């Protein structure tokens, strides 16, 4: 067995927005004293940035979920090892991604133990919950269906959950909807899900859509940023738990000056955040 010949060591896995992936031993990034200069991490093309970053073991699985609703699986050691400053290898040379297919979420795991679930959110407001163990199946080289994505819709996020977590969905209209995932019954892989958030309205004449989904944990905040660079952080406690399928509560009032909502994520105090504009400014 080839795996018996591969050392079980901690790796840093990175995937950039333009689709370059690599693994690197965690030891490469040696711990420094406070005030250190850091080490050069990666040479990126202008405008590119690291979108997914995980620390995991060479023997872990990596699950790659795409906007088309497919999932691909690799062992960490199957990902090309790069140098500290290399961009890595184009993911299309590792996974058979189709034109227009993008990785939206990466979930590393050692096993597919019971009692864990995956929550899926689509741009059209659907939410789906599936037992994690359903993905412990031989995955063909060209991937398998993780969620059935309807015409005109796409997958925007996947999160690992306990089965009883609060889910927060955020729409382009600046609203956030919070509900407990127990309101969503577990479904099989080849299903579309149920309405998690109502996005039937329009924003500046274009259809509203879900931009982000995350697990709302205690002592966290929701951070949102608009297209013109305005940011706002509010306590997760400001968003009451309601039933699924609502339009949500206003998280930020959008104006022509602020622009539309560009993104949202759950953060903790003292975390550093990095913003990259469409023209590559950081």
What are these regions (language model features)?
Residues 1-282:
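Short, structured "edge-of-domain" segments at secondary-structure transitions
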């Amino acid at each position: 067995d080839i795996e018996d010949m591969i050392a079980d060591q901690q790796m840093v896995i990175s995937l950039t927005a333009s689709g370059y992936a690599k693994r690197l031993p965690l030891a490469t990034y040696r711990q420094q004293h406070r005030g250190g200069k850091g080490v050069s991490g990666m040479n990126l093309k202008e405008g590119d940035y690291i979108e997914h970053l995980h620390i995991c073991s060479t023997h872990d699985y990596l699950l790659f979920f795409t906007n088309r609703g497919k999932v691909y699986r690799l062992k960490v050691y199957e990902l090309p090892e790069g140098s500290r400053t290399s961009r890595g290898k184009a993911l299309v040379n590792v996974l058979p991604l189709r034109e227009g297919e993008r990785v939206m979420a990466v979930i590393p795991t050692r096993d597919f133990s019971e009692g864990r679930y995956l929550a899926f959110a689509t741009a059209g407001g659907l939410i789906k919950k599936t037992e994690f163990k359903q993905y412990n199946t031989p995955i063909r080289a060209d991937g398998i269906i993780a969620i059935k994505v309807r015409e005109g819709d796409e997958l925007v996020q996947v999160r690992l959950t306990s089965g009883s977590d609060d889910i927060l969905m955020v729409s382009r209209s600046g609203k956030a909807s919070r509900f407990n995932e127990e309101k969503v019954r577990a479904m099989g892989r080849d299903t579309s899900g149920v309405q998690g958030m109502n996005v039937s309205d329009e924003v500046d004449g274009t259809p509203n859509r879900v931009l982000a989904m995350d697990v709302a944990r205690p002592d966290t905040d929701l951070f949102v940023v608009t297209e013109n660079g305005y940011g706002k952080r509010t306590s997760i406690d400001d968003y009451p738990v309601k039933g699924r399928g609502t339009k949500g509560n206003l998280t930020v009032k959008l104006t022509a000056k602020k622009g539309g909502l560009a993104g949202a994520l759950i953060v903790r105090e003292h975390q550093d955040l990095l913003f990259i504009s469409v023209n590559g400014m950081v």
